[in-house]
């Protein structure tokens, strides 16, 4: 990867602005902040660059409403679309956001066909599928931000339960980025000790872990209900930056993301949250976990929900 890659952020709302700030603080590359709303990306770019003078960052941020400015982007994060409001599911956004994603995909295909693309727009698993099909980019270069965020929420709740640092907790959440996602307690650990073993030690109960799993599934909705005017943006932005950094710096981290499946987990031609290795080529490998019959059934149910939504937009 070049020394100063060009990073494009499509959508300059709460997540887009937070992304620009985090990326500049990490000095990952120069940024183009795009939005259809005039003045918004330009104003946020100026504000963040002025803030960066206090953080010692000289990263350049260009705010624009012109798709021509995205030409030659090395990496793209897409947040454009309507956010959730109280009472809405991620799936309620499908009609409007599909149209937005198709327009974005056409311009990515035209101006940045070699970029690595991370989609955040909801409903995530459908939007990343639309991006792949409409842009014509290779599937290893188009992924969705889902499991990193869901796992971070699961990690936080587990750390609270066991009264430990979040740094000691590692978890995996599979499936679609929706209410049927599959947090896997069996593959989640506190400093290497699986959650079921900690339950056997009397440090928690199966009932309490199930409540945490349910809270993880509804983690986004909980924040939407509290904010009342939008959805989460700090954690989604931090999650996408983790993915971006692994690509730009060839870290080859194993992260749970919405990846295109070609037979893994018994699924073909669909995006779903699974562990993958992200390196300089994008998706380097899909990690196929050995699931129990019950875990596979839950995964299949989650994926079926994604499949039905995709059929609705075809």
Curated annotation (Swiss-Prot):
Pfam families (UniProt xref): Ldh_1_C (PF02866), Ldh_1_N (PF00056)
Molecular-function annotations in GO: L-lactate dehydrogenase activity; L-malate dehydrogenase (NAD+) activity
Family (UniProt): Belongs to the LDH/MDH superfamily. MDH type 3 family.
Record-annotated active site: 177 (proton acceptor)
Keywords, sorted A to Z: NAD, Oxidoreductase, Tricarboxylic acid cycle
Binding-site list for substrate: 84, 90, 122, 153
The protein, known as: Malate dehydrogenase
Highest rank taxon of the organism: Bacteria
Reactions this protein catalyses: (S)-malate + NAD(+) = oxaloacetate + NADH + H(+)
Gene (UniProt): mdh
Disulfide bonds: none
Its biological purpose: Catalyzes the reversible oxidation of malate to oxaloacetate.
EC numbers: 1.1.1.37
One Gene Ontology term from the biological process aspect of the record: tricarboxylic acid cycle
NCBIfam families in UniProt: MalateDH_bact, PRK06223.1
CDD domains: LDH-like_MDH (cd01339)
Annotated source species: Rickettsia bellii (strain RML369-C)
UniProt: NAD(+) binding residues: 11-16, 35, 97, 120-122
């Amino acid at each position: 990867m070049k020394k100063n890659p060009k990073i494009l952020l499509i959508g300059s709302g709460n997540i887009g602005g937070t992304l620009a700030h985090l990326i500049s603080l990490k000095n990952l590359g120069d940024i183009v902040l795009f939005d259809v709303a005039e003045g918004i990306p330009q104003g946020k770019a100026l504000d963040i660059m002025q803030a960066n003078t206090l953080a010692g960052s000289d990263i350049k941020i260009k705010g624009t409403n012109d798709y021509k400015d995205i030409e030659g982007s090395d990496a793209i994060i897409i947040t454009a679309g309507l956010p959730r409001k109280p009472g809405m599911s991620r799936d309620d956004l499908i009609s409007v956001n599909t149209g937005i994603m198709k327009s974005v995909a056409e311009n990515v295909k035209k101006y940045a066909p070699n970029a690595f693309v991370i989609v955040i727009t909801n409903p995530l698993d459908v939007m990343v599928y639309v991006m792949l099909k409409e842009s014509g980019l290779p599937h290893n270069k188009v992924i969705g931000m889902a499991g990193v965020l869901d796992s971070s929420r699961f990690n936080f709740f587990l750390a609270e339960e066991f009264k430990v640092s979040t740094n000691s907790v590692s978890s995996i959440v599979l499936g679609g980025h929706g209410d049927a996602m599959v947090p896997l307690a069996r593959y989640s650990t506190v400093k290497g000790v699986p959650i079921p073993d900690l339950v056997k030690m009397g440090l928690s109960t199966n009932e309490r872990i199930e409540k945490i799993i349910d809270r993880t599934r509804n983690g986004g909705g909980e924040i939407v209900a509290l904010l009342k005017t939008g959805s989460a943006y700090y954690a989604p932005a931090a999650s996408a930056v983790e993915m971006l950094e692994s690509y730009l710096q060839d870290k080859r981290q194993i992260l749970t993301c919405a990846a295109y499946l070609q037979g893994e987990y018994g699924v073909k031609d669909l995006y779903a949250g699974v562990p993958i290795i992200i390196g300089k080529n994008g998706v380097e490998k899909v990690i196929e976990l050995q699931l129990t019959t019950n875990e596979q059934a839950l995964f299949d149910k989650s994926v079926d929900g994604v499949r039905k939504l995709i059929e609705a937009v075809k």
